[in-house]
């Protein structure tokens, strides 16, 4: 089975490595991946698997299954340029909300791909741990459970992949946890203690579920791997880009400086603004996201965090 992974960032390379254990994988990226792929391919070859091959777009389109790991803010443009077949079997691994149109990932994708051919990856995982072959459990959300299981069966021995429906719940959980993760980084950076952190995360989970329920997301999704699992991982680890953004803000660094030092995309920054705008439009109560949006715009970090804890 040949799988094409679109996106050469850390997440795309990690997924290429994961799927490479059982399948032939082609990766498509504008950047030269020769050096980043060397160590991954050495590990795959040692397992008796085929190495990942970087190819151009046209060669990638010949694959049977597609995995997309493109930043959400560029996803619509990518679909427009890639011209995937309408019935392509697609697993989208991007998490976030499009700021320009305030659109969920599934809303973007269905403009280009048959909804029955779409799957969405969710759950707690870090690229750095996947490329080490460390175990994790993920969820593949899709209205087409047969397709979700097809993707699940292609995952490596160290990943337990579950097939579930509730696309909207899974993608909102995956986007919203990045917002709470920034707040978690601020909390730890200010050394507010374990009690404050527990309050923040538990109320963050409630807020995430409230927002998701408005759009039809199921409570069990937010209490499972896609929601609580991903939230607790992302909001507690230095491996999380969004958590590191929070740590930087806690040092009173301007957001622009924090992002420059990060050198990578932290989807939670733009997702925060998108969530606040959507919440305002529909009258959804989102105190943590709303306070974080003010912090990102320059509000004092101590004042913002104190207000956040009191309000949440």
From Swiss-Prot:
This protein's pathway: Membrane lipid metabolism; glycerophospholipid metabolism
Active site residues according to the UniProt entry: 177
Any one biological process term the GO annotation gives: glycerol-3-phosphate biosynthetic process
GO CC, alphabetical: cytosol
The reaction(s) this protein catalyses: sn-glycerol 3-phosphate + NAD(+) = dihydroxyacetone phosphate + NADH + H(+); sn-glycerol 3-phosphate + NADP(+) = dihydroxyacetone phosphate + NADPH + H(+)
GO molecular function annotation: glycerol-3-phosphate dehydrogenase [NAD(P)+] activity; NAD binding
KW Lipid metabolism (keyword) present: yes
Domain of life: Bacteria
Main localization (coarse): cytoplasm
Binding site for sn-glycerol 3-phosphate: 95, 123, 125, 177, 230, 240-242
Annotated EC: 1.1.1.94
Keywords tagged on the record: Cytoplasm, Lipid biosynthesis, Lipid metabolism, NAD, NADP, Nucleotide-binding, Oxidoreductase, Phospholipid biosynthesis, Phospholipid metabolism
Protein's UniProt keywords contain Lipid biosynthesis: yes
EC main group: oxidoreductase
Cellular localisation: Cytoplasm
Pfam families reported in the protein's UniProt record: NAD_Gly3P_dh_C (PF07479), NAD_Gly3P_dh_N (PF01210)
Positions bound to NADPH: 11, 30-31, 95, 127, 241, 265, 267
Sequence similarity: Belongs to the NAD-dependent glycerol-3-phosphate dehydrogenase family.
Function: Catalyzes the reduction of the glycolytic intermediate dihydroxyacetone phosphate (DHAP) to sn-glycerol 3-phosphate (G3P), the key precursor for phospholipid synthesis.
Name of the protein in question: Glycerol-3-phosphate dehydrogenase [NAD(P)+]
Organism whose genome encodes this protein: Helicobacter pylori (strain P12)
Gene behind the chain: gpsA
